[in-house]
Amino acid sequence: MIYLEILVWIAIWMVAMAIIEYSIHRWTMHRKRSWLPKWIFQDHAIEHHKKERNDINIDLPLYFHILVGSPLIIASYFISLISLLTLLTVFMYHSYTWTKLHRGIHDLENNWLMKTSYFKRAKHHHELHHERPGKNFGVVFLWTDSLFRTKLK
């Protein structure tokens, strides 16, 4: 029974993480927001995209997940220990996968993910995003662009 609970929470948090990834990338990194520090838009939309600075705004460290995800961490603590541990596991997975995919896509490192067929799809998806920054916001979870109708073929 505990395994089923773990699987259910992993599924819930993976879907939540996919929507959070898409939302943050689309609505905070590609639009100036008065309530956010200016560097968020500047580093991503201007330096990384327009000036093609592939060394800026690449990594997504775990502390960012902890900071931004703190309301979810607090809520999951009150739900159950399994909810909390699976959320933290999903945060670790996403931080690692985003960083490795993004570093590989921008030729900053050669890693094991680059040998997968998923990497080829993610690279193509992300390169289209750089050509048309208003499309293809998913980095780890490519399917979110189909869901929100922002996918370029």
What kind of feature is each model-predicted range?
Residues M1-S23:
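Membrane-anchoring/interfacial helices and their immediately flanking loops
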Residues M17-K153:
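Membrane-embedded catalytic scaffold of the fatty acid hydroxylase/desaturase
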